[in-house]
UniProtKB/Swiss-Prot annotation:
Single GO MF descriptor: beta-glucosidase activity
Domain spans labelled PA14: 395-555
PANTHER family reported in the protein's UniProt record: BETA-GLUCOSIDASE (PTHR42715), BETA-GLUCOSIDASE-RELATED (PTHR42715:SF27)
Native source organism of the sequence: Neosartorya fischeri (strain ATCC 1020 / DSM 3700 / CBS 544.65 / FGSC A1164 / JCM 1740 / NRRL 181 / WB 181) (Aspergillus fischerianus)
PROSITE patterns linked: GLYCOSYL_HYDROL_F3, PA14
Key words, A-Z: Carbohydrate metabolism, Cellulose degradation, Glycoprotein, Glycosidase, Hydrolase, Polysaccharide degradation, Secreted
Name recorded for this polypeptide: Probable beta-glucosidase I
Length: 838
């Protein structure tokens, strides 16, 4: 790669070459023009790890804690470190552009991708995202803020029209993008799938050009989400530089024709190409060649950072009677469906094949010096557990054979064209390629041998994007080839899991075969769903057991144990791109199991893993409760570090946890109805709503305890004299003394809130405007400074003037942290002023 003379290159490009540059060539690469030294660039998903170019059978990667977990750290320095490692992982994968971070707002607990965004609050989300991007781009890799904007649900995400006031748009949904860009000018922005007030974002000139480019002065590259381009002329004229993925649907000959008919002028195409070439120059110093090989890093120092991030994200929700930390020397009983499952990431774009994972059971076992016992408690899988890791090939290897054909099984003498050895029996084939496969229609036989450890009836399940028949010893057990039903897996492309059963004997070996046909063989109606490649498969199995039997056994064991930890929650099956959750509840049986174990042993510790809030009807019984999110590679070790006190928890909730789904402000207005969703809560998202209507959530935004105690004192403000205009921001510096009044070293997160004066406009009771994290030894006191700009601390969006309004009056400043102590002071705004810009 070489630095390009952008203007000279534009002059030398033909119209056909310009048009080609404005769209990808495949799922992960941009177009090249070799004669002018313009190479193809590689892009890769990056919500919580850099997957590389393959969903299917790809090169493993580091998996970071999910964004809500990172949001819970409230730690800008940590986010900077995470961003740097993300950049280094990207370079190892030969990737120039990371498709992240996600900074949408969780207006509902049910959003399928809620775990991908940092927080329900734009200030927390935007500041963390800015530092994350700064660390990432320091490596030379380009960051992509997404999804711009209001991509806050999965239901009908390609078509839904988000009806939202401009005030809510500015104060809630655009704010994290605005604040992130003040900290780090990211190289890229990705548009959202949805419409806003009638127009798809990827062709919305007001959003892309008027606000992003002109008002904010940003000059990077705007790309579509994958298959999120819906027009030729409208999108190119609105400012969409790059259509992804390729091959193009809307550019190519269609764009050339639009230019020839003056639907789009060539100088507009030049503007799009200019941004693409500027991106080439941004990433050129990396020296990553076209189609670079992908490799793994997995360095010890990276593992240490991942473990620290996992531990620092764990929120101590309750710790009555100082149940925690646990005693290492005592025996411990570990209960629950998440104990031996590594719930390390959510589903969809965030999913990847991690270098390794650590389950909570493994994490606890590694640190306990006493006996560690286990009880299942309940099964909480949405679909049957993967069978692949329990199979063996005919030559004794773990896993199964994956044999590919162009013809169906009914064709005699068909030719084998590819054979792979796999362990995971879940595969999304959107990037599988073979030179002998010319279309998306092909067939796969997956064959392995299963030897059960116990007698019983075994349930088998098959989920496909395509068709599938599962045989056990040549007997058809599951037929998922006819009368298929739409499911939620694999971005919403897959069928419902179809099941069948067979009685098996312990120690006897059975041949298991899945006959799979790719997506074109399916009869599902896929309208409104993003179609990703040739299809996918998933097959699982489990011995049929009684949940009541499991719960009773767990409760009985708990009644006799001195230390008990329950691990429950969700997994990537329940929280995933392509599907919103139907409710906030834990999987069936989980609440009953937790409640009965707590009845049997009131000192049992409950650990919940989920990316977004869940209901906790047993919370009043629990003395000790942790929220542990999806913690990445090191999730099990991170949780164990907090349980045993190696790490003193400091995390605070980045989301409000309502008592029940009906309490959340978007309850009446979530999901698409007749193609639209009304953002009826307006600016009252999350804590803004609960505080305005005086409705207590189960656990509020910003809540989190510690193994030590803190006090705050000596709050003071230093303000900047007012000027006629507010464009320079007029910084306000809050200084507060923080003391560790306990006996354990720990970190405190100081939160600065501003409450507006009474005006003629309805405003939230208070809003977060700044925060800082400080580490203190026992008895140590430090002064903490938080600087906020007056214009950001005081302003609301005036729809009549189409400007931010900083109104005259007295503004109260509140400083909070761990515990109930609130420090207060105030400052004056002497004159109402209006402003625009970043």
């Amino acid at each position: 790669m070489v630095q390009l003379d952008v203007e000279k290159t534009i002059e030398e490009l033909t119209l056909g070459e310009k048009v080609a540059l404005t769209a990808g060539i495949d799922f992960w690469h941009t177009a090249a023009v070799p004669r002018l030294n313009i190479p193809s660039l590689r892009l890769s998903d990056g919500p919580n790890g850099v997957r590389g170019t393959r969903f299917f059978n790809g090169v493993p990667a580091a998996c970071f804690p999910c964004a809500t977990a990172l949001g819970a750290t409230w730690d800008t320095k940590l986010l900077h470190e995470v961003g740097r490692l993300m950049g280094e992982e990207s370079i190892a994968k030969g990737t120039h552009v990371v498709l992240g971070p996600t900074i949408n707002i969780q207006r509902s607990p049910l959003g399928g991708r809620g775990f991908e965004s940092f927080a329900e609050d734009g200030v927390l989300s935007g500041i963390l995202a800015g530092h994350y991007c700064k660390g990432l781009q320091e490596t030379g890799v380009a960051a992509t803020l997404k999804h711009f904007v209001c991509n806050d649900q999965e239901h009908e995400r390609l078509a839904v029209d988000s009806i939202v006031t401009m005030r809510a748009m500015r104060e809630i949904y655009l704010l994290p993008f605005q604040l992130a860009m003040r900290i780090c000018k990211t190289a890229c922005v990705m548009t959202a799938y949805n419409k806003i007030n009638g127009t798809h974002v990827s062709e919305n000139k007001q959003i892309i050009t008027d606000i992003l480019r002109k008002e904010w002065g940003w000059d990077g590259l705007v790309m579509s989400d994958w298959f999120g381009t819906y027009s030729t002329s409208d999108a190119i004229n609105a400012g969409l530089d790059l259509e992804m993925p390729g091959p193009t649907r809307w550019r190519g000959t269609a764009l050339a024709h639009a230019v020839s008919s003056n639907k789009a002028f060539e100088f507009v195409v030049d503007e799009r190409v200019r941004n693409i070439l500027n991106l080439h120059n941004f990433v050129e110093p990396l020296g990553i060649p076209e189609n670079a090989p992908e490799k793994a890093l997995n360095r010890p120092e990276d593992q240490a950072l991942l473990r620290r991030a996992a531990a620092e994200s764990v929120v101590l929700m309750k710790n009555q009677d100082n149940i925690l930390p646990l005693k290492k020397e005592k025996p411990i009983l570990v209960i629950g469906p998440n104990a031996k499952t590594a719930a390390y990431c959510g589903g969809g774009s965030a999913s990847l094949d991690a270098y390794y994972t650590v389950t909570p059971f493994e994490g606890v076992s590694a640190q306990s010096q006493g006996e560690v016992k286990f009880s299942q408690g309940v099964y909480s899988y949405k679909e049957l557990p993967l069978l692949g890791p329990l199979l063996k090939t005919d030559d004794g290897k773990k896993g199964f054979k994956f044999r590919v054909y162009n013809e169906p099984p009914s064709e005699p003498n068909r030719q084998l064209i590819d054979e792979l050895h796999l362990e995971s029996s879940s595969g999304f084939l959107m990037d599988y390629k073979h030179p002998k496969i010319k279309t998306f229609t092909f067939y796969v036989d997956m064959e392995g041998y299963f030897t059960p450890e116990e007698d019983g009836i075994y349930d088998f399940g098959v989920t496909v994007v395509g068709t599938g028949k599962l045989f056990v010893d040549d007997e058809l057990v599951v037929d998922n080839s006819k009368n298929q039903r739409q499911g939620t897996a694999m971005f919403g492309n897959a069928t419902v899991e179809e099941k069948g059963s067979k009685e098996l004997k312990a120690g006897q070996t059975y041949k298991v075969v899945l006959q799979f046909g790719t997506a074109p063989t399916s009869d599902l109606d896929m309208r409104g769903v993003v179609i990703f490649g040739p299809g996918g498969f998933r097959f699982g199995a489990a011995r049929r057991v009684s949940q009541e039997e499991l719960i009773s056994k767990a409760a009985e064991l708990a009644s006799q144990a001195s230390q008990v930890v329950i691990f429950a929650g969700l997994t990537s099956e329940w929280e995933t791109e392509g599907h919103d959750r139907d409710h906030m509840d834990l999987p069936p049986g989980s609440d009953e199991m937790i409640s009965r174990v707590l009845d049997a042993n009131p000192n049992a510790v409950v650990v919940i893993q989920s990316g977004t809030p869940v209901t906790m009807p047993w919370a009043h019984k629990a003395k000790a409760l942790l929220q542990a999110w999806f913690g990445g590679n090191e999730c099990g070790n991170g949780i164990a570090d907090v349980l045993y006190g190696a790490v003193n928890p400091a995390a605070k909730l980045p989301l409000s946890f309502p008592v029940r789904l009906q309490d959340n402000p978007s309850y009446l207005n979530f999901r698409s109805e007749r193609g639209r969703v009304l953002y009826g809560e307006d600016v009252y998202v999350g804590y803004r709503y609960y505080e305005k209507v005086d409705l207590a959530p189960l656990f509020p935004f910003g809540h989190g305890l510690s193994y030590t105690t803190f006090s705050r004192s000596d709050l003071s403000l230093a303000t900047t004299p007012e000027k006629p205009q507010l464009e320079d921001g007029e910084p306000i510096t809050a200084t507060v003394s923080v003391t560790n009044t306990g006996s354990v070293a720990g970190a405190e997160i100081v939160q600065l809130w501003v409450a507006p004066p009474p005006t003629g406009v309805n405003r939230p009771v208070r809003e977060l405007k700044g925060f800082a994290k400080v580490f203190l030894q026992p008895g140590e006191t430090k002064k903490v400074e938080i600087v906020v700009e007056k214009k950001l601390a005081t302003s609301w969006w005036d729809e009549q003037r189409e400007k931010w309004a900083s109104e005259k009056g007295t503004y109260e400043v509140l400083v909070t942290g761990t515990g109930d102590e609130v420090l207060k002071t105030s400052f004056e705004v002497g004159k109402t002023r209006y402003w625009l810009g970043l």
